[in-house]
Amino acid sequence: MGENYALELRDISKSFGSVQANDHVDLTLRKSEILAILGENGSGKTTLMNMIYGIYYPDEGHIFVNGKEVTIRSPKDSYELGIGMVHQHFKLVDVLTAAENIVLGLPGKGKLDMKRITEDIQKLADKYGFELDLSHKIYEMSVSQKQTVEIIKMLYRGARILILDEPTAVLTPQESDRLFDILRNMRKDGCSIMIITHKLQEVLALSDRVAILRKGKYIDTVETAQANAQSLSEMMVGGRVDLNIDRPEPENVKKRLVVKGLNCKNKEEVKTLDDVDLIVNAGEILGIAGISGSGQKEFLEAIAGLQAIESGSITLLDDNGKGTELAGMDSISINKAGISLAFVPEDRIGMGLVGDMDMTDNMMLRSYRNGKSPFLDRKGPKALALKIKEQLEVMTPSISAPVRQMSGGNVQKVLVGREIAQNPKVLLVAFPTRGVDVNTSHVIYRLLNEQKKKGVAVVCVIEDLDVVLELCDRIAVFCGGKISGIEDGRTATKEEIGLLMTKHEKGGTQA
């Protein structure tokens, strides 16, 4: 046992039924280092982190913190050991202030001295370079500010070992850079940090070492300075990986969808889309970029008939230029009218698929209304499920297994495969590769390009700007429910898109 290790895992194993999530894993985290954890979906990264944080308990193995063997049976145990975890989905109370969230749940007697506590929190924030108004309520904050609250909350509770799950998933490039500066400051102060991410360039820019897992097994830990994106990818998948994203030239481009003056409000009567005008062309991939909550999700849902429209028009044009108005139609009406539109939602299990149902039954969700018999036809959906499993290499014991048991990447393959099988004229995809490993991401990029070549109008909300710039023909940037710019994917830069994500000025071209 090395004295310089803040954390060491020895021979850790964890299984869920017949599924071996972690298989005799060894891992070390040095004091004052940033360690990246890499692996494909289903490689056991999250399970391993959840055992360190006390959400799961290992079946076998030993955990050491600062050289001493410990037992972690709950997040309370991890807190007491100085371990904190910031999940991808934040655990905050919207109606409380930042300061109130940071101290929420801490032991104490009587009334809290919030003035003194706020001063202490502010000193901690200033120490590491956080910029945050502690008096603001959570619902008033941006995603990056909410993440800041989560990190400060862990530090205030004494965390010296910090685990971050996909920390930049919904941040702009500028926000990501600020976060990296803060993490480097924390490292200088003696904190040890573990990050789970699929963004290889961020791993190379930020981490000191990289640990790789594959199919539940520990593969190796390498010094970041001696690695590159290609070598890390090959270690993750166990073979050669092509990291290039193709962008074939658009052919026979024609208007497919015309959106004019689109306005939407949420249940609280707050405007989510504000006078949006946009043309979507057949035979192209239109990328939608923006900070989380800028209206991207609502834009796709409005087209798909899942979002009430206050005003405006959404016109679907056929090959002869004849238009069908979609505004005012719900998703069932769109389906019954035979309009060939497919939608891959952000919420894969919930809105997209039913987690407790198997692949065959999830295929039927798209077709059961079209049956002419009182009995459900399972032959077609079963054949489609088998085809998707084979062609997209879906990792599942059987098509009869509930999709909830699959990793995120395999769930996404099932969902995208089902929607593409409808032969749509318009394909709407929200966050196609969020939380998805490199190999699966490239499978999905290939599928989207195949649809583009077939003349489908593809609209993609993508959070990774590197991917947006490599994959998309045009990029519409949303900010505060408005379109702040429409750029050519071949000439735009990451910095330009990042700035447009924080501006409300209209710009760009509809061409």
Go through each PLM region and give its residues.
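Glycine-rich phosphate-binding loops of nucleotide-dependent enzymes
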Residues: 2-511
